[in-house]
Amino acid sequence: KILGERVDASFATSLKKTIIAADKEIHGVFDLIMNDYGPGRHIASVHIEVPDTWTADRIDRVTRKITNAVYEQHGVAMAAVGVYSINTKNDVAAKIHAQVSKLVLAHEGVMQIHGFFVDEETKQMRFDVMVAFGTKRKEIYKDVIAEIQQAFPDYNVQAQLDSDISD
């Protein structure tokens, strides 16, 4: 087995389906990282997108439900379930999200944008940009950030360059 080998696509898809089934308000599952320590010894981490209205109590209940379901159904121990808060209370944020997504996805090599959140009070915009391997990742990332910053000069753009490590 090769160290750092990509997670089997069907296994990753099945695991993500289990996670998203934990609650109807989970909007997406991203950044799956799985470590393989031999047969029956897998440890994983993942991010989920949830509404900005969720409480810490609800997040705790859902992440524990995910951890249990993933272990019971797949034999994978979840080291962490990270959370991306997405705007649900703000029509302005939804419009900005649509505009930013269109601009970002127009760049060749960009596969996905996720974890998007706009904070109107602090004028911050946060998201992850997944750029394909085999491309000029850092150059594409810098171009994306520059374009978004130019389109939204009043906002502080905080974008994370993300890697395509699982399906």
Spell out what each predicted region is.
Residues 1-167:
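Alpha-helical transmembrane segments and adjacent TM-loop junctions that form the membrane-embedded core
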